[in-house]
Amino acid sequence: MRMKMFAAESLEAAKAMIFAEMGDDAIILSEREVPGGVEVRAATDKLGGGMVPSGSGIISRIGAPLTPRLTDNPLRNRVRDALLWHGAPQRFAERVADSGFASDTSVTDPTAAISAGLEKHIICRPIAPRLENDILLVGPPGHGRTAVAAKLTRRASVTKSEVLPVAADLDSTAGGAQLAAYLEREQDQIRSVSTPDALFETLKTIRDNKQRCVIDLPAIVPFDQEDMASLQDLIPVIKAEPVLVISAEGHPEDQADMAKAFARCGIKRAIVTKLDVTRRRGGIVSALSSAGIAFAHLAVTPFIGGGLVPATPNRLAQLLTEDAPAHVALRGAA
């Protein structure tokens, strides 16, 4: 027989965890109330891979006090379960949950616990409104690069600094017209180029005038070797910081593969989009963490004005607290 202790907010929640892991044949051995919830000990005759002994029998027999295990903390398990609900991989959810309580086991707020855990596993580096470098926006098709280019341009104008939008329409998809529409400008007010030579000439003029720009590059398919090779060749020639624009939508493993592919091309920062239409956001957080890419901004509304929020562990934690709406992290958008 194998035994295990389960911790949850309620007896019903604990039983659900027990039967999900041990099966319908599990037997409840004991239950007791603890701060923040209940602890329930259960047993089964099945030797499943997830079964672990509930404690050291030798230590118990000699009378030594048992050290409380982190996995017996109901709030810690709530943090883990919230991340799992959001689609985060099991190992990432466990690591964040453990890290959230590693330095302070007295934490009582789930958001604070998630935030503390994320601080150990992610990097946040927002882009300043007054750009230090030109920005080259890259990303897969349909992830919102052009909208982000417009948002960065609008954000700069609000803070009394100028950022010039450049549509690198190298694939002839009318990117300039779309960018102009987002910014409510005439198309001749947008710097739109259709060839690499025209792009380099435009960038030279902008830099000679000591101005900064945001370049909206055509979509890159991260699983296409030719696309990624072209991007890798282009980045050092353009001499602008490449920033990944990636949607919160999608399968966590696909997101992880995409993030790692762009990281291999030298991308260090990302702007996460479509958080307003995505309920489960754990996959993208884990993906960027595993790829070593820093969070720059979060796009939590479709509107061009006020559409970007500087990324922080606390803002991400608010988005990962179970079924949290995106607007909880909107404060501070620019």
For the regions a protein language model found, what residue spans apply to each?
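Conserved lysine of the Walker
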Residues: 145
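Short hydrophobic alpha-helical runs that function as membrane-insertion/retention elements
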Residues: 7, 26-30, 164-166, 189-193, ...
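Conserved catalytic-core segment of NTP-binding enzymes
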Residues: 178, 195-204, 212, 220-327
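Switch II (G3) loop of P-loop NTPases
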Residues: 138-141, 163-174, 181, 185-230
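Pre-Walker A (Motif I) flank of P-loop NTPase domains
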Residues: 130-135
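Hydrophobic positions on the alpha1 helix immediately C-terminal to the Walker A/P-loop
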Residues: 148, 152, 178
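Non-catalytic terminal/linker segments enriched in charged/polar, low-complexity residues
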Residues: 1-128, 159-161, 329-333
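Post-Walker A helix-loop "phosphate-sensing" segment adjacent to the P-loop in P-loop NTPases
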Residues: 155-164, 292-295
